[in-house]
């Protein structure tokens, strides 16, 4: 009963958003200086000492989010539950995206049951959640 109430609560508070993928976020060795949330007071290097994407908690469930305006955004390191066809993954926002979410292909494959390449871009629901959902 509690589980179904939690799922219904998530669904009722979620908003629709576009989700695509970029294989740059799949590169564990890519330096965090390549993303908007690199350094500065809100940067992931500054806050956690991570130097590359593979060190990020929850990797490869990372990506860009349109709510991150650019370098040192207060939205850096926020966690989102993204739901597609009843499947939810949690993604840590590490970069700016022009439209919705642009996440690692591996993360989108987890979200779409291996269909990221075939689908390319999807409409999903999302909600900001506690960072503990993203391994922080």
Curated annotation (Swiss-Prot):
Induction entry: Produced during infection of wheat leaves.
Signal peptide: 1-16
Gene3D superfamilies linked to this entry: RlpA-like domain
Subcellular location: Secreted
Keyword rRNA processing: no
Keywords from the named record: Disulfide bond, Secreted, Signal
S-S pairs: 37-76, 79-134
Annotated TM spans: none
Annotated InterPro entries: Cerato-platanin, RlpA-like_sf
Superkingdom classification of source: Eukaryota
Main location: secreted
GO cellular component: extracellular region
Similarity comment text for this entry: Belongs to the cerato-platanin family.
Name of the featured protein: Protein SnodProt1
Organism: Phaeosphaeria nodorum (strain SN15 / ATCC MYA-4574 / FGSC 10173) (Glume blotch fungus)
